């Protein structure tokens, strides 16, 4: 974590500023599954299932296309890089910045302005949703109720997905606020304005490409291309609030009122 602050007077006893910034260089662990390096590898070692092969391998009368070969084919045929599929971590940096300006206009009027912006993101695995149809209909070799649904989705332990299937969920929040405090005789008034903007888009590696699931024996073998629910999935919320509050004193009586919209 890195941070710095700076503040002081621009005009003595009149105008002041303060700024602060923080940065975190976060790293998030990637998927733990690894591919099989050869036909003699066990299907499960230390709780990790080794389903796909690193390179194209023949087992008995079947040939399994390797993850490296799929990546090479996509690169040569479509100029598309599906990304890594094992042994990687993801950088998810975050930062915060804040600034404030205070202005003592005169003895009866003071105003301040505040600005804050935060940015963070985290990496998420692709959606594990599968077809609502019976397993034997959509999954080659599948048996109803055994291999499909959650047990054979993109995040199941029987397959591996490429990095392009992951997505980054960003979280951006910006706030601008101002407050004007004034006094006229027995009347005190506070006028506040706040604007906030929440922006949470999704991003992904590899560029635009169809979502592709390769199935085998009733379950997913590998997946590449953007998560099917990521493109166009965003949240944007803008909020404006204006508040005015006044206080009037007369003898032992105190009257308060205000509006907000």
Locations of regions flagged by a protein language model:
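Transmembrane beta-barrel wall of Gram-negative outer-membrane proteins
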Residues: 1-124, 168-195
């Amino acid at each position: 974590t890195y941070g710095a602050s700076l503040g002081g007077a621009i005009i003595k006893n009149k105008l002041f500023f303060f700024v602060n910034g923080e940065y975190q260089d976060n790293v998030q662990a990637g998927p733990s599954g690894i591919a099989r390096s050869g036909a003699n590898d066990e299907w499960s070692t230390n709780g990790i299932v080794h389903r796909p092969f690193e390179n194209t391998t023949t087992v008995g009368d079947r040939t399994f296309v390797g993850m490296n070969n799929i990546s090479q084919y996509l690169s040569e045929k479509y100029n598309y890089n599906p990304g890594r599929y094992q042994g990687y971590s993801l950088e998810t940096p975050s930062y915060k910045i804040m600034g404030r300006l205070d202005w003592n206009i005169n003895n009866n009027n003071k105003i301040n302005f505040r600005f804050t912006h935060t940015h963070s993101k985290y990496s998420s695995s692709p959606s594990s949703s599968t077809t609502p149809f019976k397993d034997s209909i959509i999954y080659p070799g599948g048996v109803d109720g055994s291999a499909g649904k959650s047990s054979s989705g993109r995040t199941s332990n029987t397959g591996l997905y490429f990095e392009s299937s992951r997505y980054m969920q960003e979280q951006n929040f910006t706030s601008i606020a101002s407050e004007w405090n004034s006094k006229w005789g027995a009347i005190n008034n506070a006028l506040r304005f706040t604007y906030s903007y929440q922006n949470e888009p999704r991003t992904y590696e590899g560029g635009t490409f169809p979502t592709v699931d390769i199935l085998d024996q009733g379950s997913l073998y590998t997946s590449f291309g953007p998560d099917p629910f990521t493109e166009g999935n965003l949240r944007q919320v803008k909020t404006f609030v204006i508040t005015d509050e006044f206080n009037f004193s007369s003898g032992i009586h105190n009257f308060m009122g205000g509006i907000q919209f």
